[in-house]
Amino acid sequence: MTADDQLAVADLHSHLVPGVDDGARTLEETLDGVERMTQAGIRKIITTPHVDASLTREPAAFSERMDEMDDAWARALEAVTERFPDVDFRRGQEVMLDVPDPNLADERLRLGGSSFVLLEWPRLQLPPGTVDVLVRLRRAGTRPIVAHPERYVGFDHGLELVTEWRRVGAYLQLNYGSLVGRYGVEARTLAWRLLGRGWIDYLATDFHGRPHLKLFWREAVQKLEEAAGEEQISLLSVTNPQRVFRDEEPLPVPPLLGKRTLWTRLREFLNLEQN
């Protein structure tokens, strides 16, 4: 791996396979989306079209859906490789857990040929039994990454559920846009709380490849820099996502404590004086 590769921003969550979900509709939008990501400094991309886990219960329907995905992916990969030869462009899936007992053995459901799988639950609502599902997936040999937990409606204000997810070996992926209010105040607040606990393992764009949509990468990085989060940026945007490409577990991310306020510095000074 070259020095440039080691510093390359990597993204694990986007929708750039043309015409298969609510992301890029055409090959032109795929190429435009990749170009916009490279302009933001992203050089490693695992794009993740939606697929419902319930399809794995119906072999014929699953095969038809994956054949459709494979054909569109082949066209996208050829075009991206030709136009952006320096981009490491791979495919996974964002798996919708619409059943409690999914079979995710098919390697195409994993992120870029790794053992990691990107997961979400339907309609941004959490059903009962999410911990049990994650345990079963872990026992089956997959490494679950929960996509954008901050976006779930009324989600886990006490963070007890996140604690359980992490205890059973799940990882968490936060959207850049959440840090700047893209999904509302509640999602933004929870996003920063999770960073403050050190419980986020990856940042990703969740970019849907449409011309009117933004990446929010630069805006989010600026906010993190303002919060003294340079180490977190490096781990969440570069180091840990790159480790997925090598099928390696993420490194621990320290809690984001933010800049010390004037009041905090004053209290520290007074305590020193008293001591």
Locations of regions flagged by a protein language model:
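An N-terminally biased module of ancient metal coordination in phosphate/nucleic-acid-related enzymes
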Residues: 1-83
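Active-site neighborhood of phospho(di)ester-bond hydrolases with catalytic His/Asp-centered motifs
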Residues: 9-12, 46-48, 90-93, 145-147, ...
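Active-site beta-loop-alpha junctions enriched in small/polar residues
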Residues: 15-17, 50-51, 92-96, 122-124, ...
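Charged helix-capping and loop-helix junction motifs
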Residues: 26-29, 132-134, 157-163, 185-195, ...
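Non-catalytic positions within long, well-ordered alpha-helices that form the structural scaffold/packing
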Residues: 38, 138, 195-196
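Short acidic/histidine-rich active-site segments
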Residues: 50, 197-215
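Extended substrate/RNA-proximal surfaces in nucleic-acid metabolism proteins
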Residues: 56-173, 256-274
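Mid-to-C-terminal alpha-helical segments outside catalytic/metal-binding sites
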Residues: 222-275
